[in-house]
Swiss-Prot record:
It is found in: Cell membrane. The keyword Ribonucleoprotein does not apply. The lineage of its organism: Bacteria, Bacillati, Bacillota, Bacilli, Bacillales. Activated by a signal molecule generated by ThsB. It comes from Bacillus amyloliquefaciens (strain Y2). Keywords: Antiviral defense, Cell membrane, Membrane, Transmembrane, Transmembrane helix. It holds the Pfam family ThsA_Macro. Disruption phenotype: When this gene is missing the Thoeris system does not confer phage resistance in B.subtilis. This is Thoeris protein ThsA. GO terms for biological process: defense response to virus. Signal peptide: none annotated.
């Protein structure tokens, strides 16, 4: 596999997508038009009181138009390469940036998505090794420790059980929990996030995704103890969205929208940081996210 070529194609694709999004964005176009009209018009009004001939006035006007275009181009480039943003949502600070959940310092809470059974069997059948929960288990648990973790999850009375003794042809645990249930493990929040279809593929409908995120925010709100919470862009990995073709930009919008309507409050020093994995930040229109501070989705 040509990984370098694949990454290059991803970079170009993300760049072109952002370019088109900015060109089509009505807010940006209105701002650009206001710059072109405001600066030359304001200065032209001022110089109209000066004793200048027509040629000088034309030169000044052209310089001002050129300056306006430079301002617009500089802002366009800045937005095009923007890869992080901090929002104030209902009084809570929410930062969105590229990052690795496993590089977050200890004593900050981190969210890891599991399936609705809280499976811990990393064998590329039940849990794939390259997934975040697969990496989490391999990093922090030996075989003996996993047994202890399984028992702690089983004994947690706060987890809402949906069904017991579920028959699963590919193996795994048999107790199914409510989507959005959160189990606190050290400084990690393990979330029951995805379902399995008959072919053992992680999947989620869009309405289930939104409902799950509402539960996640409310659960985290009772557990974070005024600490910063780092959460990956949930659903951007191997989870299939069976009733819609949504990308990472749409998933991020849903995460922010559910955060807003949940009315969860993270007061200083607590805040939420949404981490974008690998090249996901290239598929996000950060400029558009500012609208959440005004009116949400």
């Amino acid at each position: 596999m040509n990984i370098i070529g694949s990454d290059r194609n991803t970079n170009i694709g993300g760049f072109m997508w952002k370019f088109k999004e900015l060109i089509r964005d009505k807010t940006f176009r209105r701002w650009a038009l206001s710059i072109i009209l405001t600066i030359p018009t304001s200065v032209s009004t001022f110089i109209s009181f000066l004793d200048l001939d027509a040629r000088c006035r034309l030169i000044i006007l052209l310089i001002l138009v050129g300056l306006s275009l430079v301002i617009i181009i500089v802002q366009f480039i800045r937005l095009l390469f923007m890869n992080n943003i901090t929002l104030n949502l209902n009084g809570s600070e929410v930062e969105i940036k590229k990052g690795d959940i496993f590089e977050v310092p200890r004593n900050n809470y981190k969210v890891i998505a599991f399936n609705e059974y809280f499976d811990t069997q990393v064998d590329d059948v039940i849990i794939a090794r390259e997934t975040l929960n697969g990496q989490y288990i391999k990093r922090y648990y030996s075989h003996q420790d996993i047994t202890e973790l399984d028992q702690k999850i089983k004994d947690d009375v706060k987890l809402k059980i949906e069904e017991k003794n579920v028959e699963r042809p590919f193996g795994g645990k048999t107790t199914r929990y409510s989507l959005g249930s959160v189990f606190k493990d050290m400084d990690f929040f393990l979330v029951a996030f995805s379902k399995f279809d008959r072919e053992n593929r992680a999947q989620l409908k869009l309405n289930e995704y939104a409902s799950c995120m509402l539960n996640v925010w409310n659960e985290i709100n009772t557990l974070h103890a005024s600490k910063e919470v780092f959460i990956p862009l949930l659903g951007s990995g191997i989870t299939r969205h069976v009733d819609s073709d949504v990308g990472v930009n749409e998933l991020l919008h849903i995460m922010l929208w559910t955060f807003q309507i949940s009315k969860v409050k993270f007061r200083e020093p607590a805040k939420v940081t949404i981490l974008l994995y690998k090249n996901d930040h290239k598929k996000i229109n950060f400029y558009k996210l500012k609208e959440f501070e005004k009116n949400g989705l």
